[in-house]
Amino acid sequence: MEQPVGQPAYVLHSRAYKETSALVDFFTPQGRMRAVLRRARSKGGSLVRPFVSLEVELRGRGELKNVSRMDSTGIAAWLHGDALFSGLYLNELLMRLLPAEAPFPTIFEHYTLTLQALAEGRPLEPLLRSFEWRLLDELGYAFSLNQDVNDQPIAADGLYRLRVDAGLERVELLQPGLFRGIELLALAEADWDAPGALLAAKRLMRQALAVHLGAKPLVSRELFRKR
């Protein structure tokens, strides 16, 4: 019988399951895993909360596994205020966009570092935009910020629109939702101090993610608006 192997993990989401169990979605380097935690009200159940660095052993070959062991591996990333809402936003992105049981070790590493940075109180917007971009890239949805859809260099004085299925397209007529070339070039260099860069990055990532997230609103985004 195959023995479970411990792996690092974070809880993305959990809910009550039957009388004393919980259905838990974990994020691990091996992907998003769903498992049943028996006796969820016991001492181990106190670890079933977001942003706690864990080591878990999961049993089972199907999509719904069982937690055979779960231990904390360090100090939790205590998030408060807007940092907490930001962390919940990251979790919701992973829940909505990651296919089940598909390995994404690079995203896992970047997620861990982003949680640490949020806990340290670093500026939120650059952290969120960087994570969104890395997520799009790892999922195969990224596009060039240096070249347009016709393989021409992004011009600082140009205007561009995002074609989600292809990339950035230069346009001549002013219309809603466009991006200035100088802003796109700043984003390509992760120059968050450039005028307009953070706002442009937020608009660009929202447009890029929308088609993959679908019509259902993000709960974390609504919570952030109502804070």
UniProtKB/Swiss-Prot annotation:
Keyword field contains DNA repair: yes
Keywords of this entry: DNA damage, DNA recombination, DNA repair
Keyword flag Nucleotide-binding: no
Pfam families in the record: RecO_C, RecO_N
SS bonds (residue pairs): none
Gene Ontology CC: bacterial nucleoid
Family annotation (SUPFAM superfamilies): ArfGap/RecO-like zinc finger, Nucleic acid-binding proteins
Residue ranges crossing the lipid bilayer per the database entry: none
Gene Ontology biological process terms, A to Z: DNA recombination; double-strand break repair
Database matches in HAMAP family: RecO (MF_00201)
Function noted in UniProt: Involved in DNA repair and RecF pathway recombination.
Record family assignment: Belongs to the RecO family.
Stated name of the protein: DNA repair protein RecO
Protein source organism: Pseudomonas putida (strain ATCC 47054 / DSM 6125 / CFBP 8728 / NCIMB 11950 / KT2440)
Gene name of this polypeptide: recO
